[in-house]
Regions:
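Extreme N-terminal leader/anchor segments
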Residues: 1-92
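Generic alpha-helical structural element
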Residues: 18, 56, 100, 148, ...
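Aromatic-lined, polymer-binding surfaces characteristic
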Residues: 60-61, 69-74, 80-268
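Solvent-exposed loop and beta-edge segments used for protein-protein assembly and interaction
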Residues: 61, 105-107, 364, 453-457
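Residue-level detector of short, conserved catalytic/binding motifs and their immediate flanks
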Residues: 65, 370, 461
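Hydrophobic side chains in beta-strands
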Residues: 69, 372-374, 465
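Carbohydrate-active enzyme catalytic cores, enriched for enzymes
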Residues: 93-96, 245-385
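Extended repeat-based interaction scaffolds and adjacent low-complexity, acidic/S/T/P-biased segments
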Residues: 391-502
Length: 502
């Protein structure tokens, strides 16, 4: 558990959190992982029975890199000194090499970003031999082949640091140009990137695609790049602010949700770089609301660690690439600590979040989503008619998601044709004020066209099945059970009344 200062309801009437609460949370998380460092401090082997597909050594590097990033945002010289000891050993043969599509490429980006952010406090204080070994280890990221998704930005992030540090500058600039050019293919407008080819929309849009591009431009003092990426970030934040429930909970959609309050990184990024449409008080209310939701909900265990899960351990939130230290990607949520105490994001009085102001329906044409929120219960619902994932992940293929429920293996929010819940080749048919539509393939020759109309807390869903043999059973499911919320499924036409339920 984490001990925090008393609530400050004068400046933060909605969450009670101030900068002091964020500092205390960061300090507690950093202190809790320290006992799990190896004697040379190059690896952090966090407890848990799970080993990721990359192996224990890579998982230990992940523990070092992701908590180093938290230390970089906190900028505590004593803590950074401990990570300096790890740099003396890690790149000299302890850490696994950076290879094509290997997990160390991911962690190299965190190491490089942390070193760039804290250069006077950490990098500049290392001796020449340690700097040389670290730069040589990082340099493999410049030519390692990434997966064709947000991974393209890891060589960019490493390249930005190495170019600034004067190491392999030409190769670094080539890696930067290559990665930034690659992601242009995935920008679909209105502040939205797909995470690779296809229609993969999720939180990686904010905590990866926007985060790495905008930070690179900002740290490089490249006005032209920052203007381009900053405009995109600002446009995204106008939508992103609506992804949080009245209780601070982020929408549960997409993979890697065990990163928890990393969802707040783009909020802080907008304030840090001046590219945000949100008032300072609203930015802090959204970010602090998310942090409080997780801390109050039990996301930190009795050892002070972040386990794999959501509000506490939960294997349904785990991917095969997840290791014991994976949740510490949540460190990105502490980006706001780079803003000085006197910045308006810390001094302004909290303002109400969108979900708490009024009932709202908000179309997002780029991903073909529709957001529906109700002030009375603070629940936000996302009607998904544009994002899919070839891995049949329930966090992508459902018709709807919310801030109060998690998808179930039993196919909630689905249309099952002949028992088949397939939902691929989603074709967006548009979205507007209060409606959204799409067509998807169940299996070869069978499609479902879906239209949803919403108002207040009510949803009307209509589905047209084409290509199925006469008499094929069709089952339509609604919301899964959620704590403190109630949903009713009432058939209006074409469905048996026996299917009505709660």
């Amino acid at each position: 558990m984490i001990r925090l200062p008393a609530d400050d309801r004068a400046s933060s009437p909605y969450t009670g959190y101030t900068r002091a609460h964020w500092e205390a949370a960061a300090d507690a998380l950093l202190a809790a992982v320290e006992p799990y460092a190896t004697p040379d401090r190059a690896l952090y082997h966090l407890p848990g029975g799970r080993v990721s597909r990359s192996g224990r050594l890579s998982d230990g590097l992940e523990g070092y890199a992701r908590t180093l990033l938290l230390a970089a945002f906190r900028r505590d010289e004593t803590v950074l000194g401990r990570y300096a000891e790890g740099l003396a050993a890690g790149p000299g043969g302890v850490w696994p090499r950076i290879t094509d599509r290997g997990q160390p490429l991911v962690e190299a980006a965190s190491v490089a970003l942390a070193l760039r952010l804290t250069r006077p406090l950490l990098w500049d204080r290392l001796d020449d031999a340690v700097r040389g070994r670290t730069a040589a280890w990082l340099a493999d990221a410049l030519t390692a082949r990434p997966w064709p998704c947000n991974w393209e930005l890891f060589p960019v992030t490493v390249g930005g640091f190495l170019a600034e540090a004067g190491h392999r500058e030409e190769a670094a600039r080539k890696a930067i140009d290559r990665g930034l050019e690659r992601i242009e293919d995935w920008y679909v407008g209105d502040g939205w990137y797909t995470d690779g080819d296809g229609r993969k929309f999720d939180y990686y849009n904010g905590w990866a695609m926007h985060l790495y591009t905008v930070l690179h431009a900002w740290l490089s003092d490249d006005g032209e790049l920052l203007a381009r990426y900053g405009r995109r970030l600002s446009r995204h934040l106008a939508d992103h602010a609506r992804f949080y429930g009245g209780d601070g909970a982020p929408l549960r959609q997409g993979r890697s949700l065990t990163y928890r309050f990393a969802t707040t990184a783009p909020l802080w990024l907008g304030a840090l770089t001046g590219h945000t449409p949100l008032p300072a008080g609203e930015t802090r209310r959204l970010a602090s609301g998310a942090l409080r939701y997780f801390l109050d909900g039990g996301a930190v265990d009795e050892r002070g660690l972040l386990p794999l899960g959501w509000l506490g351990p939960d294997p349904s939130f785990v991917q095969d690439y997840s290791g014991p230290a994976s949740p510490y990607w949540a460190s990105k949520g502490f980006l706001g600590l780079l803003l000085p105490p006197g910045h308006e994001v810390w001094t302004a009085r909290e303002e109400q979040a969108p979900a708490g102001r009024a009932d709202a329906v908000h179309p997002l044409p780029a991903p073909n989503w529709l957001l529906q929120s109700t002030r009375s219960d603070g629940v936000v619902r996302l009607h998904n008619h544009g994002s899919e994932d070839v891995r049949w992940d329930p966090y992508y293929t459902r018709l709807a998601y919310s801030t109060a429920t998690s998808p179930l293996p039993a196919y909630d929010n689905s249309v099952l044709v002949g028992g088949d819940p397939g939902r691929t080749e989603i074709e967006p048919l548009g979205t507007g004020e209060g409606w959204i539509a799409s067509r998807h393939t169940v299996r070869a020759g069978i499609t479902v066209t879906s239209l949803v109309a919403v108002r207040g807390a009510v949803e009307v869903r209509a589905h047209l099945v084409a290509g199925a043999a006469p008499g094929t059973p069709v089952r339509v499911t609604g919301w899964p059970a959620g704590e403190g919320v109630r949903a009713e499924l009432l058939p209006a036409a074409g469905l048996s009344a026996e299917l009505a339920g709660v």
